[in-house]
Amino acid sequence: DFYKSVVNPETAWLYGCGACNASLLGIGERTGNTPLEAMVVQAAQLCGMDPKVNYPAITEIAEYFRNGIGHDITSNMPLVGRDFNTTRAGIHADGLLKCEEIYSCFDTQKLLDRPVAVAITDKSGAAGIKHWIDINYGENVPKDDARLLAIRDKVDAEYEVDRTTAISDPEMHKWYAEAFEQK
């Protein structure tokens, strides 16, 4: 109940306990339920990945809860939240482009079938936009590409008129099409 629902059973494992009680997404009749998905990842961190475990099922379970039964998962919830592995800072996006291991807690693509994501804001800069394009279009464009800079100018213009929210993916797709698919 005091944010110890993962560290307590993990510590118990280290001292010889063979199991812990847990529930999917930590959902239960009270607060402080241990999320099963967290313990699966903790076990992998402690003992190494088990080839018999389907780790991407964690993402599939979250998608089922979100889309199948309409359960609202907090966007920043570890492992399953929509934005748990999303950066908004251009310097981090640039770091991800150079060496993802430094800026990501683990290989989220390998473990959860979820790539590290970038949300575009006034802090993203050309590096954040480049990473977004790489993820969404598989196009390796340089940060000084005129088309990319045209998108950055549109992002900057949004925040110059006091925008406070991230640029949405539909907006980015539209701006990408305008900049990259011009005839």
Give residue spans per PLM region.
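Catalytic cores of alpha/beta
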Residues: 3-15
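Conserved, mostly hydrophobic/aromatic
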Residues: 16, 39, 133
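Catalytic-loop motifs flanking and including active-site residues across diverse enzymes
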Residues: 8, 32-38, 125, 129
